[in-house]
């Protein structure tokens, strides 16, 4: 009977074993490593923890489903056995009652048989329960071992997953730091580029202003040189006229001298006898001045005199001739790509025309302004202005420019005077113009041009 009494203790041991297997989320989370110091934000940590907990709950569910199935099968088997034993007792118990009142021996025999039967049933029940418990214990032991192995594998995978997550967090932190540094470097570089761009634009603007001033100075110098050349030509012409006049006078004097010498050669004088002395005559008139003698030697230089009063400024001279074309400058930066054209050829200008020439490529320059055609005065009229006019009319370039109404005098108003062009303008209206409508110029100074065909 001691063996039968040990059955509840074994059942308690199995219950303790089952209780030892039970675990919850807190025990599992306690096994997890502490939070990394240099990790991502709180939301990312919560997401990773939620994922780990969901995985753990799924594993626990997978482990508990077979256990519940085995326990349910054992309970069903035990109930089936109880039902069979109860049916046997029900079949045996009515037999002594059906025979009525028998002898006492039969009653004792029946009681002994019933007692033995009950003992046998209890032993059979205990053996069946013990056998079932042994089978359950073996199955549970095997299952617990498998569960422990799986749980250890899950913990190992979780630890490796957390370590990899921590490594990724460290890598992400390093990448974020490097990105912050790179962003700072890019901002500094952008600021330096903007500063350099501003300086370059400022220097370019200053250089453009200096180039304009230099071109104006060159233009003024060319005008002064042209005026000096015209003065030189005028003085040379005057000197040539004076020399021609002096040569004529010299030739006349030589001719007179030759005639006088011939006359003196033909005169002969005969000396007669001396006459009586006459009375003293009156004093005659003074004779003519003699021929000036040769200049004497140069004397020693005298002392330097005091500085005299500065004279009045002279009259502005005539504009000088046009200077030679300068060397081409450096190539500028490449401009932006222009918009797509319509495909049609460039039309000739409708505001400029050439009149009075031998063909359409030359003539007097006339401009249409305020509904009327007018001419251009030839003051400061040079090749760059003629180049702009020829290009606006569709020609390749300029051959020469003309002044002083070379193609005849025009009629109507004189619109422009002292036109200054750089040679890159598309029309003469884009050149530097002081004013429209000139009164200090006449049609004797109308400008003309000959374009290259």
Swiss-Prot record:
Recorded superkingdom: Eukaryota
InterPro entries for the chain: Collagen, SR-AI/II, SRCR, SRCR-like_dom_sf
GO molecular function, one term: heat shock protein binding
TM stretches of this protein: 51-76
Extracellular side stretches: 77-453
UniProt modified residues of type Phosphoserine: 27
Region Disordered: start-end pairs: 267-295, 313-349
PROSITE patterns reported for this sequence: SRCR_1 (PS00420), SRCR_2 (PS50287)
Residues listed as glycosylation sites in the UniProt record: 82, 101, 142, 183, 220, 248, 266
Record-level GO BP terms: protein homotrimerization; receptor-mediated endocytosis
Subcellular location: Membrane
SUBUNIT field: Homotrimer. Interacts with MYO18A.
Protein's UniProt name: Macrophage scavenger receptor types I and II
UniProt source species: Bos taurus
């Amino acid at each position: 009977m001691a063996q039968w009494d040990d059955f509840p203790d074994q059942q308690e041991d199995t219950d303790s074993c089952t209780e030892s297997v039970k675990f919850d989320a807190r025990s599992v989370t306690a096994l997890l490593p502490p939070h990394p110091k240099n990790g991502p934000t709180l939301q990312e940590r919560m997401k990773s923890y939620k994922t780990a907990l969901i995985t753990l709950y799924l594993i626990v569910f997978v482990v508990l489903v077979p256990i519940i199935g085995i326990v349910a099968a054992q309970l069903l088997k035990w109930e089936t056995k109880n039902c069979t034993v109860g049916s046997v007792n029900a079949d045996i118990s009515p037999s002594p009652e059906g025979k009525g009142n028998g002898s006492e021996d039969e009653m004792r025999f029946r009681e002994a048989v019933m007692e033995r039967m009950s003992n046998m049933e209890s032993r059979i029940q205990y053996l069946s329960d013990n056998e079932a418990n042994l089978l359950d214990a073996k199955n549970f032991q095997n299952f617990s071992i498998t569960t422990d192995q799986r749980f250890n594998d899950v913990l190992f995978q979780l630890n490796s997953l957390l370590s990899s997550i921590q490594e990724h967090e460290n890598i992400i932190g390093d990448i974020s730091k490097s990105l912050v540094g790179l962003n700072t470097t890019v901002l500094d570089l952008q600021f330096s580029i903007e500063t350099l761009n501003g300086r370059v634009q400022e220097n370019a603007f200053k250089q453009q202003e200096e180039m304009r001033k230099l071109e104006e100075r060159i233009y003024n110098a060319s005008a002064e040189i042209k005026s000096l050349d015209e003065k030189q030509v005028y003085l040379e012409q005057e000197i040539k006229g004076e020399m021609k006049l002096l040569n004529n006078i010299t030739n006349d004097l030589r001719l007179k001298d030759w005639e006088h010498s011939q006359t003196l050669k033909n005169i002969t004088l005969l000396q007669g006898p001396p006459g009586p002395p006459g009375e003293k005559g009156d004093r005659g008139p003074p004779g003519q001045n003699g021929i000036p003698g040769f200049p004497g030697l140069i004397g020693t230089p005298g002392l330097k005199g005091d500085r005299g009063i500065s004279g009045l400024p002279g009259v502005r001279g005539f504009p000088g001739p046009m200077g030679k074309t300068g060397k081409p400058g450096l190539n500028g930066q490449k401009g932006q790509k222009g918009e797509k054209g319509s495909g049609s050829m460039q039309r000739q200008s409708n505001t400029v025309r050439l009149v009075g020439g031998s063909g359409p490529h030359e003539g007097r320059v006339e401009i249409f302004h305020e509904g009327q055609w007018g001419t251009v005065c030839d003051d400061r009229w040079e090749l760059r202005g003629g180049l702009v006019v020829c290009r606006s009319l569709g020609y390749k370039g300029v051959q020469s420019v003309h002044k002083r109404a070379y193609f005849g005098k025009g009629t109507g108003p004189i619109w422009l005077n002292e036109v200054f062009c750089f040679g890159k303008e598309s029309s003469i209206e884009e050149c530097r113009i002081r004013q429209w409508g000139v009164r200090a110029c006449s049609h004797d100074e109308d400008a003309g041009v000959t374009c290259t065909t």
